[in-house]
Curated annotation (Swiss-Prot):
This is Aspartoacylase. The record marks 63 as: Transition state stabilizer. Its EC number is 3.5.1.15. The lineage of its organism: Eukaryota, Metazoa, Chordata, Craniata, Vertebrata. GO terms for molecular function: aspartoacylase activity; hydrolase activity, acting on ester bonds; metal ion binding. Belongs to the AspA/AstE family. Aspartoacylase subfamily. Its cofactor is Zn(2+). SUPFAM superfamilies: Zn-dependent exopeptidases. Homodimer. Pfam families: AstE_AspA_cat, AstE_AspA_hybrid. The keyword Acetylation does not apply. Keywords: Cytoplasm, Hydrolase, Metal-binding, Nucleus, Zinc. HAMAP family: Aspartoacylase. The active site is at 178 (proton donor/acceptor).
Length: 313
């Protein structure tokens, strides 16, 4: 009996990035550990390379030195002539692209897992860049099922103007892993354990796939970005209101028109306008104050994946 499935090439090269942001310590801590003792991330027939992406920022325990490394992996920055005048992160991006890419080439790594923390109450989050990627939808379904009953959310950043050029985007299959809440420059054991399990399940999925296991059609719930929301500001551009207590820590929960969104110092509530229910994420994220983002609005939808199987079997 034959089944109708998509034959995918086997996965051979995997990288795990930590320290893309130097003050998000779970990935830094895990990658440093795996560089010393990588037994738990090794799988038969698979090359798995742990890697510290922004060592200078890690050393200073800061998000970045000159600019955000996780926003500059576009072909323009990757193609700039190397010189000492370039921002440190642009030079580093070119080095990373040389080691793990080149981006959009046959030689690039198959999968890059990029490990991040958020100060927002987002729990375990997988970040997806392409809603039509059967392989990653299948992987995310496997991770979500394996983590249950612990919730694991999928954040889809596929958007013509809001998608950004991530560090992991040089891989054929880019995977963002975001776990919180955790303050910048801090390690929490519970967050560490959750991220470690996410990587374990992801590598197990790849191993099963390479061994010839067929994954039947599946569906996952995802939250797709639709808009970034700035804080209310005064005429000088200063923040004029804070996240309302009713919204604080309510990532992934429905926010209805009329629900409190911001609170001013004189006690005035600013509600959500419009006529659509949204699902906020990255609520009050510390790193996004400089980006003028109080939270991101998402809409909830379902993605379907076809059956997949490794082409070697």
């Amino acid at each position: 009996m034959t089944s109708c499935h998509i034959a995918e090439e086997p996965i051979q090269k995997v990288a795990i990035f930590g320290g893309t942001h130097g003050n998000e310590l779970t990935g830094v801590f895990l990658v440093k550990h795996w560089l010393e003792n990588g037994a738990e991330i090794q799988r038969t027939g698979l090359e798995v390379k742990p890697f510290i992406t922004n060592p200078r920022a890690v050393k200073k325990c800061t998000r970045y030195i000159d600019c955000d490394l996780n926003r500059i992996f576009d072909l323009e920055n990757l193609g700039k002539k190397m010189s000492e005048d370039l921002p440190y992160e642009v030079r580093r991006a070119q080095e990373i692209n040389h080691l793990f890419g080149p981006k959009d080439s046959e030689d690039s790594y198959d999968i890059i897992f990029d490990l991040h923390n958020t100060t927002s109450n987002m729990g375990c989050t997988l970040i997806l860049e392409d809603s039509r990627n059967n392989f990653l939808i299948q992987m995310f379904h496997y991770i979500k099922t394996s983590l249950a009953p612990l919730p694991c959310y999928v954040y889809l950043i596929e958007h013509p103007s809001l998608k950004y050029a991530t560090t992991r985007s040089i891989a054929k299959y880019p995977v963002g892993i975001e776990v919180g809440p955790q303050p910048q420059g801090v390690l929490r054991a519970d967050i560490l354990d959750q991220m470690r399990k996410m990587i374990k399940h992801a590598l197990d999925f790849i191993h099963h796939f390479n061994e010839g296991k067929e994954f039947p059609p599946c569906a996952i719930e995802v939250y797709k970005i639709i808009e970034k929301v700035d804080y209310p500001r005064d005429e000088n551009g200063e923040i004029a209101a804070v996240i309302h207590p009713n919204l604080q820590d309510q990532d992934w929960k429905p926010l209805h028109p009329g629900d409190p969104m911001f609170l001013t110092l004189d006690g005035k509530t600013i509600p959500l306008g419009g006529d659509c229910t949204v699902y906020p994420v990255f609520v009050n994220e510390a790193a996004y104050y400089e980006k003028k983002e109080a939270f991101a609005k998402t809409t909830k939808l379902t993605l379907n994946a076809k059956s997949i199987r490794c082409s070697l079997h």
